[in-house]
Amino acid sequence: MAQGARSATVSRAVLISRILGFCVYVWAFFLPACREVATPGGDAPDVFLGSRCAWMTLVNTFSHEIWHSKYFLAVLSGWINPLLLLYLFLLLFPKLFWPRRILAGAIVAFIAGTWVLFAIIPLVPLIGHVLWIAGILLILIGEAMRRPERI
């Protein structure tokens, strides 16, 4: 296969992956994202939709008490969505490869922080969280498949 044909195939696959990823990402906000751990003899655990999780974690950015507790990881997870939107905006500028790559790395690190938070609190991830992560990774996979463009 010629280099140009391979490049076109990779570009098409990345575009399809990003579009599919964005659709899954948005869909995940309307699904149950996590719930509290059930305790024997206790009330039914609270279940949180993805949109509620996103809102609560982003709003808590402005709480100084949160930054000095174990819940600061929730604030970091709240910044995944704005960072992903910034990443999508930067896709409009092909020469901004390195800022996109740095954002992608930060997003992946914040995802790991979310999982640590789930273990500490403890929360149980549900289908909305799994699809949210899958959508994000489908969007970001293009960074692993592309080489930096020569300037």
Regions found by a protein language model. Give the residues of each.
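Compact integral membrane and secretory-pathway proteins
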Residues: 2-151
